[in-house]
Amino acid sequence: MIKSKVSEDQRRQMIAEAAYFRAERRGFNGGDATTDWIEAEAEVNERVRQIESAHLLQCLEEGLATATKKLSSLKRKASSVASGARTELQRDVDKLSELREALRSGVKELRAQGEQAGQLARRQAEKVWDELSDVMQRLGSRTSH
């Protein structure tokens, strides 16, 4: 899973500061602290969503580049191993290639949606990312022996 860029504590701190600055702008006269908080929360949530979207896209693009390098390396290794091991390694290479293409498609979709990227698209991309990471880790430990 891709780690969140903004923690819940940081988010709450940002909301508190934004609410404070709202009250400060009106000279701490009038207004309602609850309304300040709710409006600040909406602003901060939007900013955090933008930050998280950019962070997710960056992580997925980095993962895609890593998967492409790993796939090239595994293809070279597969051609030089014994035929019995080659079949198993080739299945893993094919699986990694399939996952890489799914991730590439997800990244392309997220990039096209930009700020409008939905939670479903993000979850799907993260799921593919998790599977891809598992396969790369398993292959890395198997081929390093």
Predicted region positions:
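Intrinsically disordered, low-complexity, basic-enriched segments
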Residues: 1-145
